């Protein structure tokens, strides 16, 4: 089994999305750089071309903090130029990033052997570079989680290709399957918070939502046993959280609650899939199985409509007449830092429990 580790072995690196995602000029990236540096966050860039990544790396808070890049979402490894694109990123940035993330594909099901063969060829090419970053295959196409774990088992011997476990994607898939099993195939994502049936079905919805944590823990258990480095995309979600800026049900903060137009158990909100306690269990489980040297976390939380005064960074936006988007960016960055604290606290708990376990064996 491959035991190769990333270069941040003393503590698992914690990264976050490093993007604008809010309209404005490069002052927003300067703001992100300052806030990431203050928090000690690593950077996960989204880049479709090497030239785009070169520009983004100019805003990297520090060369000492870990960095990874998420390649374009529609990358199809069966297209002739795609493996070469992966190799180009690896060769050009191998001294500046430790990982590259791409989405999995539905062909994992329909062309399993062919997909594995492509990954084996990519792994051989990455190995020939020397010092190549990892290629992490993210669970994103919505296939059966069992098929995803089968894929990783089939490439367990590869040195440079491993998994990106997106806990939000896997959690939502588990919720959908759980709800459908007990409701004659009904899709929980067809329900909206304003629907009349929601109030009566709230208990059953939350029962399905509460099952997501165990579903993700099972995937971590299976893949963790392979002994390969794993990258994690961390974010929360809920089937009724469909009114966000991107119209999706996940990429929420672990501190978010889901507002509802009625009272449920004395509150006018629902809990998301994980929350801080679920996140803590996921982080500690990962560290127990993998150790910090084979674990990396990235907060993939999207912006909300909140605003936060610019304060000490207002000088970056003197040329802006309307500071609204700058304040929205500042708020989003504060959310990332708050969630980073949750992850780091969970890591500390994991370290303490591991130390206690070792003491028990002395």
Enumerate the language-model features and the residues they cover.
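Structural motif corresponding to the early beta-alpha repeats
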Residues: 37-114
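Catalytic cores of phosphodiester-bond-cleaving enzymes
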Residues: 114-140
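Basic- and aromatic-lined ligand-binding clefts that recognize polyanionic substrates
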Residues: 132-156
């Amino acid at each position: 089994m491959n035991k190769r580790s990333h270069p941040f072995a003393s503590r698992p690196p914690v990264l976050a999305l490093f993007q604008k995602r809010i309209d404005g000029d490069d002052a927003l990236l300067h703001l992100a750089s300052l806030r990431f540096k203050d928090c000690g966050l690593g950077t996960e860039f989204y880049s479709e071309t090497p030239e785009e990544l070169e520009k983004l790396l100019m805003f990297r808070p520090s060369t000492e903090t870990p960095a990874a890049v998420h390649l374009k979402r529609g990358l199809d490894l069966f297209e002739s130029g795609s493996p070469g694109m992966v190799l180009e990123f690896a060769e050009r940035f191998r001294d500046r990033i430790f990982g590259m993330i791409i989405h999995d594909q539905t062909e994992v099901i329909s062309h399993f052997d062919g997909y594995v063969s492509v990954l084996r060829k990519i792994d051989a090419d990455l190995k020939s570079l020397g010092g190549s970053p990892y290629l992490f295959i993210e669970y994103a196409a919505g296939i059966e989680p069992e098929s995803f774990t089968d894929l990783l088992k089939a490439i367990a011997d590869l040195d440079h290709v491993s998994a990106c476990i997106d806990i939000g994607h896997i959690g939502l898939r588990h919720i959908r399957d759980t709800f459908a099993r007990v409701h004659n195939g009904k899709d929980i994502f067809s329900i909206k918070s304003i629907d009349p049936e929601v109030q009566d079905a709230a208990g059953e919805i939350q029962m399905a939502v509460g099952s997501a944590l165990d579903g993700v823990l099972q995937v971590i258990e299976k893949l963790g046993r392979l002994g390969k480095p794993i990258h994690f995309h961390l974010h929360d979600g809920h089937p009724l959280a469909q009114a966000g800026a991107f119209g999706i049900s996940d990429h929420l903060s672990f501190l978010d609650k889901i507002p509802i137009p009625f009272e449920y158990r004395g509150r006018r909100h629902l809990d998301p899939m994980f929350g801080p306690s679920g996140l803590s269990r996921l982080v500690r489980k990962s560290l127990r199985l993998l150790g910090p040297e084979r674990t990396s976390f990235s907060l993939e939380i999207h912006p909300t409509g909140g605003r936060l005064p610019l304060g000490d960074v207002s000088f970056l936006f003197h040329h802006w007449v309307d500071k609204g988007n700058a304040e929205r960016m500042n708020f989003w960055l504060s959310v990332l830092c708050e969630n980073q604290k949750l992850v780091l606290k969970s890591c500390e708990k994991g370290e303490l429990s591991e130390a206690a376990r070792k003491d028990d064996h002395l």
